[in-house]
Amino acid sequence: GSRNFSKWCAQNGIPLQNNQVDIGVRVELPSIVWEDFSKKIYEPKIWYRSKGYGDKTRMFCFNERGSVVTENTDGVLTVNGHSYRDQSRKTENSNFALLSTIRFTEPFKQPIDYARHVASLANLISGGSVLVQRLGDLENGRRTDAKRLANSTTQPTLNAVPGDLSLCMPKRQLDNIIETLHALDAVAPGTANYDTLLYGIECKYYSARPQTENFMISGCKNIYAIGDGAGFTRSLSQAAANGLYVADQICSEN
């Protein structure tokens, strides 16, 4: 939706704002590591600002005793995570997203294409799949292979290809992720364990948004921009509420 909306705006001469993207990994570790938090908080969320670059890295989308999964978006495979209500489908691991936010400056204006390119590199290196790597192997500058993964104390819930994330993820984002993992280790010891698994690539897009007044596009009477695709919300519930709000607004005016 966001790409179609951006294309429509370009065709109609409507300027857009927002030039950032989140790129990172899906972290998987034994559920006991974050159990103290997950038993009290439905979804722990933490933001961390790196000392090296001053970038924001965020932990979110926490799945207690869940599974890592793949997503296919227009032929590009990325990773995600979920957990099942059915107790029989629970796992021994928990997973969460750990993404670094990068805001681009002029003249670059294609952050979504940038993220898709990074993800496609992981697809290329893995032979059409996604990658998984132990944190310890990543920090020691070596690839995780099938033998090392089999010996890992954390066993993967997704059949990803063991590999080297440093071959596809930009250094800046990778540095931010490693630094954040060690900061999280101070909160939940064991987070930065050698056998903590990192799956890549995971991306979250920030849709470009137009200038609006009460969600009506500036210079375009009776044309409204709302929801995730227009860059105003970041979830299904927010987008639905945004639609209801604007609908009430239109009805009150008429």
What do the predicted segments below correspond to?
Residues 1-254:
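Residues forming the flavin
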